[in-house]
Amino acid sequence: VCGTDHHIFQGEAPAEPPVILGHEMAGKVEKTGENVQNIEFGDKVAVNPNIHCGHCYFCQRGEINLCKNLQAIGVTRDGGFAEYVVVPETNVHVFTGDISYEEGAMVEPISCCLHGIDLVKINSGATVAILGGGAIGLILAQLAEMAGAARVYISEPDPRRRKIAKNLGFRDVFSPQEIKEKIFEHTMVGAEVVIEAVGVETTARQSLNLVREGGTVLFFGVCPEDLKIPVSPFDIYKKELTIKGSNINPFVTERALDILTEGKINVNKLVTNRYSLKQLPEILSGEIEDSGLKSVIVFN
């Protein structure tokens, strides 16, 4: 269950009913189409939900995540909150070994985070600040360390999530009220890279106050379309700031699967709740408190 599913259910994200939600998924192949060549019955697969057209200006340039005709399984067409889902062959990725279906369902968020980390080009020894200690924030934090960050700061208001972050081995985990003082106490100048991984006004504003001169701010968290924050062009000019956005996961799903298969990232500690499909409406409506980090829908 992704935060986007909650936003769609509450009418805050662009999806039109009737559509079955669920874009983070893994499962077993039950049937293949007559033209399918590389996928077989019984294969365990993770799904990349994003389907690009291959013909528009951006697709022709290799920028498939910016496709003008982009479709998304679980957003614009029926998704994984069902016993069966139809997926194009090009969007399924076979995994083997000891990878569980729960881990396989995390390939999609890992791949999105991997694209974001690629965009900010973390230098060896860099200081990185992650605003948001949810599942996405903690995936980003692990990938930032893999990319060479010497110190990763995590800002998270929920003490339960801060505890999980520390259990993953991160020492610099603080509340939003503490994070600025702690970063400047260590660096004197601010973080080289700041990643906003929540998608709300307070963290969007704060991100610009934590980055050092010559640094990069990445807006990763999906925010409401009408959210606006004040930005000073003079500060961007004077400090030579780079401000970027990160949108889905072009050409990185296999890399994400490899990282997971090789044990380079821990997602098991991120899954804190397991529910049945029948409980899904209560989760999305808030009747069941979706506490902890990541909730998964388990099919028996």
Task: List each language-model region with its residue ranges.
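Glycine-rich beta-strand-centered segment in the early N-terminal region that forms part
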Residues: Q10-Y57, T96-D98
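Short glycine-centered segments of the SAM/dcSAM-binding site in methyltransferase folds
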Residues: K44, T127, G215-T216, T242
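NAD(P)H dinucleotide-binding glycine-rich loop of Rossmann-like/cofactor-binding domains
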Residues: C53-L131
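Mid-domain Rossmann-like dinucleotide-binding core that forms the NAD(H)/NADP(H) cofactor-binding site
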Residues: I99-E178
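Glycine-rich cofactor phosphate-binding loops and adjacent beta1-alpha1 units
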Residues: V120, K163, N167-E240
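Residues in the short beta-alpha loop(s) of Rossmann-like NAD(P)-binding domains
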Residues: P157-D158, C223, N249
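C-terminal hydrophobic helical "lid"/dimerization subdomain
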Residues: R205-N209, P250-N300
